[in-house]
Amino acid sequence: MSNPQDQLSNDLANASISGDQSKQPQQQQPQQQQPYFNPNQAQAFVPTGGYQQFQPQQQQQYGGYQQNYTQYQAGGYQQNYNNRGGYQQNYNNRGGYQQNYNNRGGYQQQQQQQYQAYNPNQQYGGYQAYNPQQQQQQQTQSQGMSLADFQKQKAEQQASLNKPAVKKTLKLASSSGIKLANATKKVDTAKPAASKEASPAPKDEEASAEPEAKKESTPVPASSSPAPAAADSTPAPVKKESTPTPSVASKSAPVSASASVVTADALAKEQEDEVDEEVVKDMFGGKDHVSIIFMGHVDAGKSTMGGNILYLTGSVDKRTVEKYEREAKDAGRQGWYLSWVMDTNKEERNDGKTIEVGKAYFETDKRRYTILDAPGHKMYVSEMIGGASQADVGILVISARKGEYETGFEKGGQTREHALLAKTQGVNKIIVVVNKMDDPTVNWSKERYQECTTKLGVFLKGIGYNKDDIINMPVSGYTGAGLKDRVNPKDCPWYEGPSLLEYLDNMDTMNRKINGPFMMPVSGKMKDLGTVVEGKIESGHVKKGTNLILMPNKTPVEVLTIYNETEQEADTAFSGEQVRLKIKGVEEEDLQPGYVLTSPKNPVKTVTKFEAQIAIVELKSILSNGFSCVMHLHTAIEEVKFVELKHKLEKGTNRKSKKPPAFAKKGMKIIAILEVSEPVCAETYKDYPQLGRFTLRDQGTTIAIGKITKLL
C-alpha cells in the first residue's frame, strides 16, 4: 500500500505539470505565426536559467498588449499602459523591451513579425511616449541585429532623416523642457536632475505653442510620464547594453554632430549656473536666510537677549531653560541663565562674558535666522570682526542702566568700535536696541531712552550710516518685552513701534547673488571623519558633489556633504547661508581661516600687493612708508605693510593731491599701496564688496578702515 504522503506529492506534481502545459499554449500563442521558431527549443530552454521566470511576466503583458491594442485608435492606449507605470517605463526598467529579447537572441524575429495586423508605421510610443510616428526610426534602429546590418540601417536612416530633422528636434524639446535644436538627447543624458527641475516651467508655454503635442500628451499624466521616463531610462541602457549606445549618438545629431555636442555642453553649463527660484521655495517654503550679529559693550545684555529670543521662538525648549536656571542659581549667577543658552563653555559662564562668536539658529513664520553673538570685551575684537564679516544686519545692544551706557560709549568702551567695525565689514543696516529698560534706575523712562539714542545716532551718522538705516527700539532682554511681542503700553506708552522680531521679519529682502560664481571665505575648520570647513556663502550656490577650488593654494576639492544652520544634511546651499561643508582633496592642517572656496570657472583673485583707499580713524602718532599693522580682510588676518602713500584725499571733495603725502594721521583719507607677505584672496570693492573691504588694527585698537581699489 502506497504512502498517502507520496500519493499527495505525486498529485501535486501532476497538477503542476498540467498547469504548466495549460499555460504554455497561452504563452506560445503569438509565436505560432513564425514558421522558423521551434517551440521545442523553448521547452528545452526552460530549466537552464532564470528566463522562464522572466517569460511569463513579459508575455502576459505582451498578451495584454493585444487585448488593449484596439483602444489605441481610441486614444486610450497610452493611458492603459501608464496606469501600469507606463508601457515604456516597464520595459525600460528591465533594460528595454527590445534589448531584453536582443540579449537572449532569436526573439527579435518575434518582434519584427508585426503583431496581428499591427501597422508597422505606428510604433507604440517608444521612449518618450510623445510622438509615436516620429519614434519609428528609433525603434527599428534599437532592435537586435549584427553590426553590419546595424551600420547599413544607420546609413539608410541618416539619409531618410535629413528632411524631418527640424520637426523631430522641436518635438523632443517639448518633452525635455529645453528649447534647443539637436541637443535635447545629450542634455537629458548629462543632466537628468536638471531636466526634472526645468520641465514644469516650460510646459505651459509649449502647450499653447504646440497644440499637436498637447493633444497627444493629454491622456498621459504630465508629471509622471514624459520627463521622468527620459531621465530614469536613459542612464540604465547606456551602462548595461552595448547596442543602443551608438544609436543614441547617431540620433542625437543627424544634421551636424559636432555643432550639437558643443551646444549641448554650453547648455549644460548654463543650466548648472541657473538656479530655479522654485527650487529655493520648495526647499525652504520661500523663507530667505538672514544672519544677525549682536554687538555692543561687555555686559550690555547681548547673550541674554539672544538666549531669550531662542526661547521665545521655540528653538530652545522650556526644560532646557529651566535646567540652565537651576545651574545658574547653584553657581550663584542667578540672573545669567538665559545667556547660558548662548555662552556654552565653562569659562564664559564663570566670567559672565562671551569669548568666542556664539552661533545659534531660529526660525519665524517669514524668515530663517542665524544669530552671531559677538564678544563685547576689547580683548576679543578680532573674533567680533570675524563675526561681523558674516552678518547681514547688526543689532547694537546698549544698556540704559545708569553708568553702563556711559562706560560703553565713552572712550575705551566697545560700543563705538563695534559700530565702526560692523560698518567696515559691510553691515549696512543697524538696529540700536536700548536694553535693560525695565531696570529700577530707568523704569521705561522716555528721557533716558532719548539721551542714549541721540548721542549714539550722531556718532553712527558720522561713521557712514544713513539715517534710514538706523532703527532704535526699547526692550528688556531679560523679561522679553519688545523682543517677540510689542512692549506693553502700560509700561511704555510713548513707544508704538514694532518689536525686534516684527521689524526683522518685515525688512526688505536681501539682494543675494544666487546665480553668481560660488565664493565662500572659510571662517573655521575642523576634523570630523574628514575635513570640514565652515563659513558664509557670499555668492552663488553649491550642491553635493560640486568640484571647487580652494584658494590661494589652488587645491581642487570636492563637496561631499553640506550641513545647514541646523546641522542637518542638505543637497544645496545658497548665497547668504551659514554652512559647513565636508570636502575631499585637502587635509585640515593644510587650510586656515581666510582661504576661500571658489568656483573653478571664475576663481577669486590672489594677491600680495594692492592699492586701497584708507580712512584713518584712530592713531596715536602718525604713519608713513614702511608702517606695519594687522589687516582683517573678510575672514583672513594678515600682517600688512604700507609700501607707498600715493595721494591724500581732500575732505568733502575727495580730490587727490598731486604730491604724495609724507605721512598720514588721524582723520585723514589716503590712497596707498599695501603689501602682505603671503598671498591673500581679495577682490576689488567695486566687484565684490565683501572680499574688498578691510580693517587695520594696531596695539589692540582699530586704526583705519579701507577698501581695495586695484589689485596689483
Swiss-Prot record:
The record's region (Several sort of repeats) falls at 16-143
GO terms of molecular function: GTP binding; GTPase activity; translation release factor activity
Positions of region (Charged): 144-282
Segments carrying the region annotation (Disordered) are: 1-64, 76-115, 132-162, 184-256
In terms of PROSITE patterns, this protein maps to: G_TR_1, G_TR_2
Q: Name one GO biological process term.
A: nuclear-transcribed mRNA catabolic process, deadenylation-dependent decay
- The reply to whether Transferase figures as a keyword in the UniProt entry is no
Record's compositionally biased regions (Basic and acidic residues): 202-217
Chain segments carrying region G4 = 435-438
Give the family per the record.
Belongs to the TRAFAC class translation factor GTPase superfamily. Classic translation factor GTPase family. ERF3 subfamily.
- What protein am I looking at? Eukaryotic peptide chain release factor GTP-binding subunit
Which species does this protein come from? Answer: Candida maltosa (Yeast)
Instruction: State the gene name recorded for this protein.
Output: SUP35
